[in-house]
């Protein structure tokens, strides 16, 4: 299975597989350039974009503003069963700079550990490189060389700041799970071997 590029700061929440899309905030992916080079050194700049992981998105009731998930638990006043929460809860767009502290400039991306906004704050973030608006970028690792410059000068001891590859569905699971209309465009489908117990959705269901 192809691997996907992720840029990661520590997560204190868990993976998520969002099913639907809300309409409170339009999703606008930050732009990011990267270069693809031939063996002879001829490089071509690729105008791409990144997307924030669904786990850092507002999960709320469809056509409403009631939280579905808060303080690492489901809000039973909003939904009260696996079927109910799966059907009712949707993810919204991200204010990347002001809510998550994610900024891009040409071929660089900056992530903040903590970002304060509107009487609250966010901790950590995770982003994925995109092929286009609705598909993650996949890489063939065999017989290819990949290079990154990573600035860790402001990362303090004990903070997990990582850049790595992970196997995922390129479309974020849209083709595998009929109820999943958010997909890669909304950062859905992260998966790794650690099996976080705080997962909100697994296999398209709560």
Where are the predicted features?
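A long-range scaffold signal marking pre-active-site subdomains of enzyme folds
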Residues: 15-206
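Fungal secretory targeting signals
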Residues: 1-20
């Amino acid at each position: 299975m192809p691997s996907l590029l992720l840029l990661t700061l520590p997560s204190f929440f868990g993976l998520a597989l969002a099913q639907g899309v809300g309409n409170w905030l339009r999703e606008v992916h930050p732009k990011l350039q990267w270069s693809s080079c031939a063996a002879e050194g001829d490089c071509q700049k690729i105008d791409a974009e990144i997307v924030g992981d669904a786990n850092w998105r507002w999960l709320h009731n469809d056509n409403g503003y009631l939280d579905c998930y808060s303080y690492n638990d489901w809000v039973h006043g909003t939904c009260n069963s696996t079927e109910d929460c799966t059907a009712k809860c949707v993810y919204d767009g991200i204010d990347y700079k002001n809510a998550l502290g994610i900024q891009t400039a040409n071929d660089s991306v900056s992530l903040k550990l903590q970002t304060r906004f509107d009487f609250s704050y966010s901790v950590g973030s995770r982003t994925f490189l995109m092929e286009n608006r609705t598909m993650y970028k996949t890489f063939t690792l065999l017989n290819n060389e990949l290079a990154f410059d990573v600035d860790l000068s402001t990362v303090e001891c004990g903070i997990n700041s990582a850049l790595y590859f992970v196997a995922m569905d390129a479309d974020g699971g849209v083709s595998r799970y009929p109820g999943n209309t958010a997909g890669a465009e909304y950062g859905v489908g992260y998966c790794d071997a650690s099996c976080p117990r705080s997962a909100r959705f697994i296999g398209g269901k709560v």
